[in-house]
UniProtKB/Swiss-Prot annotation:
Single GO term (MF): mannitol-1-phosphate 5-dehydrogenase activity
Disulfide partners: none
Catalysed reactions, as listed in the record: D-mannitol 1-phosphate + NAD(+) = beta-D-fructose 6-phosphate + NADH + H(+)
Protein name as annotated: Mannitol-1-phosphate 5-dehydrogenase
PROSITE patterns: MANNITOL_DHGENASE
Organism: Salmonella typhi
GO biological process: mannitol catabolic process
Coiled coil: none
Binding site for NAD(+): 3-14
InterPro entries from the UniProt entry: 6-PGluconate_DH-like_C_sf, 6PGD_dom2, Mannitol_1_phos_5_DH, Mannitol_DH, Mannitol_DH_C, Mannitol_DH_CS, Mannitol_DH_N, NAD(P)-bd_dom_sf
A GO cellular component annotation in the UniProt record: cytosol
Family: Belongs to the mannitol dehydrogenase family.
Amino acid sequence: MKALHFGAGNIGRGFIGKLLADAGIQLTFADVNQVVLDALNARHSYQVHVVGENEQVDTVSGVNAVSSIGDDVVDLIAHVDLITTAVGPVVLERIAPAIAKGLVKRKAQGVDAPLNIIACENMVRGTTQLKGHVMNALADGDKAWVEQHVGFVDSAVDRIVPPSASATNDPLEVTVETFSEWIVDKTQFKGALPNIPGMELTDNLMAFVERKLFTLNTGHAITAYLGKLAGHQTIRDAILDEGIRAVVKGAMEESGAVLIKRYGFDADKHAAYIQKILGRFENPYLKDDVERVGRQPLRKLSAGDRLIKPLLGTLEYGLPHVNLVKGIAAAMHFRSDEDPQAQELAALITEKGPQAALAQISGLDANSDVVAEAVNAYNATK
């Protein structure tokens, strides 16, 4: 089996690429970073530090790399069996034209073997969004062939992969936590279902997408925003602060009540899942910076993302949300010289005030009780 993976960054190398290579799949990375491409093609291997209770170093071998903006990547798309991505939500649109060209070439060469594409991004139904971008880049005459022969498979991914401390010395070395979860929608595949250790197949993906978004992502973001306000450097420092921990755990319990109501998750098992996530945040081997985790606050405060979406669920079911609101207020306070969205957020609040700014960013009604609650919490944490 041959696979092409877009995105040779930390998540690409430390998570999805590693699982594919470990499964014996012939793997080629596609990226724009020439330093990483050259290193991969010189060595065809790299090291992954897996950190947790038992630290180990795994070697991923037998890999190649191509530029994601050259002809080689188009040629590969015509022949591989699987395409995966870990490029970040914003970059999906940028790789779509190359994928479209490769699919046209595949059709022209008469390659009718099924191809499956899986976007492994921190977003809801990322592959469906990628499919939209690919279809927009195709001529009408090619769309029916693509619908017939190409599966666009949505997935939920979960593994904390912070920037590697040794990245200055070795561009390929990466550190990851022990925990990983890759859940894919088995109803969307074309052809036989793949057997890849570490890839879980489900016919109820949205339950797992929202479980991860409402728990890991919600908790991670709130830990970062409260941690930044309190002057903590890392997620571990922040979650060991009892005041922050109480709000984060409370927010995950509030979002969890929505999941239990919506999808019928077992309450005891979900409580254990929350505890496991708190333990992951405490991992002393992960130097996870609050500034990194908090970046892009406008996206994280948007209607379908990790703060507002669970809040909307609490409103839908008439459930408490006091800790989620505290997290939203902390997000509104996020400031970073390194992050354009943080600067845009600050400018918007200065220009319009917190009430109108939050309504504009989140889509919540400016005159609603919940916006008033968030503004009160925002003002209380100044």
